[in-house]
Curated annotation (Swiss-Prot):
Residues 169-198 have a biased composition (Acidic residues). CDD domains: SANT. Pfam families: HSA, Myb_DNA-bind_6. Residues 591-664 form a coiled coil. It is found in: Nucleus. One of its GO terms (molecular function) is chromatin binding. This is Chromatin modification-related protein EAF1. Residues 275-290, 492-507, 773-782 have a biased composition (Low complexity). It comes from Cryptococcus neoformans var. neoformans serotype D (strain B-3501A).
């Protein structure tokens, strides 16, 4: 199936003129020694073939035997006798006479020739004989003939038998005792016995007779006039006909019976082909005597166009390492084209520069020389009728060949017509005789021999046209492109006017006098004729009609050749020139654009240099960094590395401190559980908190300040310090603090808590005395009324927000504001450290009397918590007295802050990603201690239960009656000191 598909593709390419008919010469490669495996494979192939043929032969034999057995069983007894060996029936052997038995035998006296004729007649009429008598007669005559032959062989030679044999051959013999006629020589025939010669002399043993003389004359005549015997004939297509056959017609007749043999026959008897070959038309030149007409022809003689498949050829001359490439066992079996039937030779292998002299090839000494014996004398119809069995279809006669497509050379109207010289015509005729109708090879050889200029090369169609209309069947016929009234084409030797030598006139140049050349062009193809322009007559156009009595045209051109031969410009000279200039300009523009793009691309590629990454620049348009920038970058990198190292060390310390803090907290919890629940704190103890009494005189539980307010204040102060360090504008009230971020690790909180406790322990005692002194100073009267010491006004959730620079809006007519708790005062001091703290948690407030503003110490929302106002005696931005003492070098002990408050403060700062310095923490603790001291000084004389505890500072109170509210809202001075002002005596 693969072979069939491959052959179909080859035929399709042939139809499209895409299959090359010129096969290159097979190159001889180096010798490949055969291995043991190669021999095994070859023997395997032959064994496979033998087994297949043997099986086929056995099947055929079994079939023939079966037919004969059935025929014998269906035959009559007489027919069975004829079918059996010896011609005797079943059991007839008993009737055969025994040799030596005295039986009655009938003598048959007939001559040898007559006996042969009788036997032939009887053998041919065996089926028509009736009765056993006739059959017995035939058998007896055959037996007698055999006996006579044996006796003749045993006895000496008899002259009479010699005469009878000569009679069988057909020679004339004189009668016994009869003289020769006219005494003429008998050409070797023997005279009668006892007859004298013509000259009357006796004939002896030592006398040379006339027969010897005549024989010598015959030998001399044969030597002098020896006829020329027929040799092998080479056909135009390269096939070599054996000398047995005179022409291809005899081969076709001789192998006809072989091709007509039915497929059921497994073998072919070549002996039966002898009579058929001898019955062919006798040739004028006899074959050599060595070729006997009775000898059957071999298959290679009957089929010279086929490759014989033989077995592996053994190496000759002990050349074991060279494979015989000429052997038939490795021949190609696929018949792709007729070129495989011949041995094509490329013109380049003939070396025309050395072997072509004056138009004659000197190739008589080369290995590729083959004498052309009558190749040009064979009629073309014989060559065309001869076809190989692999062709698949009978070749069509030449009359049915269609006119090929006319090639269109480039710029055909601008090209002058080619003229054929007598030398070129002679070379064309020689090539046509050498390569009959192979126009591709003819054109190639012609261009190699004659043409030296590439412009004047001939294509196959031009060669065919020149031969057909000058020397072929179309010599005396009008051309297809000539008008009916045009004269016949001029011969090749026609002389043009104005030239001294005979120059052939091109067929297309013959025109009608007085008519322009363009007017003589017929529109056979249906295209409009050109009315003007520099154009010449074109070649014949394919019409699809049969070319009568024409030679085979050249093969069609390939698609590439047709595209190359297509004219690029058409029209007048001016239009052609304009088109050419326009195309040249476009080509120039395209070249410029391509060159520009290529140069730009090359320049872009040159900028990219494969160097080390330390030498490359990520941003080509950015200037290189200065030394200062490089040093700064290195410093920042070192700072980051140091911070990372410090952070890792702090994490390790936090882990250790967390363990210690956890143990301390557990011990503190155990002590708190062991203390009685109603046991009050001792007021004289340094760490004891002031006791707050309720309305009924019972001590109230100590209320811790709002931890969230303290945390917000510390976070806002830290954010403000950071913004000031980064170059922010100081005192901008619109800057809001950063939000507090939750989620800091507990290790950081524990570390900050321990640091706060250590610093608070150093300032435990000093703030107690400082608070008492400030309490005494705050009771001094001022401006004709009882003035309170500097206090921090804390507004209720309804109080209007304000900045620390403004006075408190909640103050009464006398400027006295309600005093908050110490925890609230500490929060107000923390808010004073930064102007941004005052903007936190501003809630709208109507003008509510101060006695109705209830401080909320338990909320943690920044909107509900109230901002703390600065004392009136301290300017904005100024430090507290404690801070002034510190600046003067006085060591002030601070009161211990609540552990939970400090821990919450540090946790809030750590959650916001801020690191609090010891100075900030120390200042915060001092402010908290100062507020606690102020709270304790205000609780010096809480008053009596009858007067109420509404003036107790730092305690949550609620209005219970309108009279009490009025008393609180408008305090008035009295000449008598009393508990109305909230001061005890």
């Amino acid at each position: 199936m693969r072979h069939v598909r491959a052959m179909e593709r080859i035929e399709a390419k042939k139809a499209e003129n895409r299959w090359s008919l010129r096969q290159p010469k097979k190159a001889r490669g180096p010798g490949v020694p055969k291995s043991h495996w190669d021999y095994m494979l070859e023997e395997m192939e032959w064994m496979r073939t033998d087994f297949a043929e043997e099986r086929r032969w056995k099947v055929v034999e079994a079939r023939e035997f079966a037919y004969q057995v059935v025929e014998w069983h269906l035959a009559s007894p007489e027919e069975k006798k004829a079918l059996m060996v010896g011609g005797r029936g079943w059991g007839e052997c008993r009737n055969v006479p025994i040799p030596g038995h005295a039986g009655k035998r009938k003598e048959v006296t007939v001559e040898v020739e007559a006996e042969d004729e009788d036997v032939e007649m009887l053998v041919g009429q065996e089926g028509e004989l009736d009765g056993e008598g006739e059959a017995n007669k035939v058998l007896e005559s055959i037996d007698e003939m055999r006996v006579n032959e044996k006796e003749r062989e045993n006895r000496p030679e008899d002259p009479r038998e010699t005469v009878n044999i000569n009679q069988d051959i057909g020679e004339e013999v004189d009668a016994e005792g009869e003289a020769d006629a006219d005494g003429e020589p008998e050409n070797g025939e023997a005279d009668a016995e006892g007859e004298a010669d013509a000259d009357g002399g006796p004939v002896g043993d030592d006398v040379v007779g006339l027969s010897e003389i005549d024989a010598a004359q015959d030998d001399t005549r044969e030597t002098s006039e020896r006829p020329s015997y027929r040799r092998d004939t080479v056909l135009p297509n390269g096939l070599v006909i054996h000398k047995r056959f005179a022409n291809a017609y005899e081969i076709a007749i001789a192998r006809g019976p072989v091709l007509d043999t039915p497929l059921a026959n497994a073998t072919v008897d070549l002996d039966t082909l002898t009579k058929s070959s001898s019955a062919a038309t006798p040739a004028t030149v006899p074959a050599e005597p060595s070729v006997s007409p009775d000898e059957p022809a071999s298959f290679d003689q009957l089929f010279p166009d086929l490759a014989m498949y033989s077995g592996p050829a053994p190496p000759e001359n002990d050349k074991k390492y060279r494979r015989d490439e000429g052997g038939t066992y490795s021949h190609r079996m696929a018949h792709t084209s007729r070129i495989m039937d011949i041995r094509p030779i490329l013109v380049s292998t003939l070396q025309p520069a050395k072997n072509l002299i004056d138009g004659e090839w000197d190739l008589h000494d080369g290995p590729y020389y083959e004498e052309v014996k009558g190749a040009a004398d064979i009629p073309p119809n014989v060559v065309a009728a001869f076809n190989t069995p692999f062709g698949g279809k009978a070749s069509r006669p030449l009359e049915h060949m269609r006119v090929p497509e006319v090639p269109k050379p480039a710029a055909h109207h601008l090209r002058a017509q080619l003229l054929w010289s007598p030398e070129e015509d002679k070379c064309l005729l020689k090539l046509v005789a050498m390569y009959p109708f192979n126009w591709d090879l003819i054109a190639d050889s012609f261009n190699t021999e004659m043409i030296l200029i590439p412009v004047e090369k001939r294509n196959p169609y031009e060669c065919w046209e020149r031969w057909y209309y000058t020397f072929g069947e179309g010599k005396n016929k009008p051309r297809q492109d000539a008008p009916p009234s045009a004269p016949p084409p001029a011969p090749a030797s026609a002389t043009q006017p104005g030239t001294a030598t005979a120059t052939p006139v091109p067929q297309s140049a013959v025109t009608t006098p007085g008519v322009p050349p363009s007017a003589n062009l017929p529109s056979a193809s249906g295209r409009p004729q050109q009315t003007g322009g520099n154009s010449v007559s074109s070649l014949p156009t394919p019409t699809g009609e049969a070319l009568p009595d024409g030679a085979p045209p050249p093969p069609g051109m390939s698609k590439r050749d047709r595209m190359a031969a297509k004219p690029k410009y058409e029209g007048t000279k001016r239009s052609v020139r304009h088109q050419a200039i326009y195309d040249a300009v476009k080509r120039m523009n395209r070249r410029r654009e391509a060159a520009r793009a290529k140069s730009h691309k090359d320049n872009a590629q040159r900028k990219v240099i494969n160097v080390h990454e330390s030498h490359s620049m990520s941003f080509p348009h950015v200037a290189a960094s200065t030394p200062w920038e490089l040093v700064e970058a290195k410093y920042q990198r070192d700072v980051q590395i140091a911070q990372q190292r410090q952070q890792r060390a702090m994490q390790e310390q936090q882990r250790q401190l967390a363990i210690r803090q956890q143990q301390a907290m557990m011990s503190a919890q155990q002590q708190a559980q062991m203390r009685p629940p109603n046991m009050p704190n001792v007021p004289n103890m340094p760490n004891a908190q002031p006791i707050r009494m309720g309305p009924n005189g019972q001590p109230m539980p100590t209320m811790a300040p709002s931890q969230q307010q303290l945390l917000n204040a510390v976070a806002a102060a830290t954010a403000a310090n950071r913004q000031n360090a980064n170059g922010a504008v100081q005192g901008n009230p619109n800057v809001r603090p950063m939000p507090v971020v939750q989620g800091q690790s507990p290790q950081v909180q524990q570390q900050m808590l321990l640091q706060a406790q250590q610093m608070a322990a150093q300032q435990a005692r000093v703030l107690q005395a400082q608070a008492q002194a400030q309490a005494q100073q705050g009771r001094a009267p001022s401006m004709g009324g009882n003035l309170q010491p500097p206090q921090l006004g804390v507004s209720s959730p309804f109080a209007q927000s304000r900045t620390p620079d403004l006075p408190a809006e909640g103050a009464g007519p006398s400027g006295i504001n309600p005093t908050p708790s110490p925890a609230m005062q500490a929060a107000a001091i923390g808010a004073q450290s930064s102007p941004q703290i005052a903007t936190m948690g501003r809630a709208p407030s109507n003008n509510v009397p101060p006695h109705l503003r209830v401080p909320n110490a338990g909320t943690s929302s920044p909107q509900i918590s109230s901002p703390m106002a600065l004392p009136q005696g301290i300017p904005n931005g100024a430090g507290m007295p404690v801070q002034g003492a510190q600046t003067q070098g006085i060591q002030i002990p601070a009161a211990m802050m609540n552990n939970a408050t400090v821990q919450q403060l540090l946790a809030t700062l750590a959650a916001s990603g801020q690191q609090m310095t010891p100075e900030q923490l120390r200042g915060l603790m001092l402010r908290s201690a100062h507020m606690q001291a102020q709270a304790q000084s205000q609780v010096g004389n809480p008053g009596t239960p009858q007067m109420g505890v509404q003036n107790i500072q730092g305690v949550q109170h609620f209005a219970r009656s309108p009279s009490l509210q009025n008393a609180q809202s408008q305090p008035r001075s009295s000449p008598k000191p009393g508990p109305a002002n909230g001061q005890g005596t």
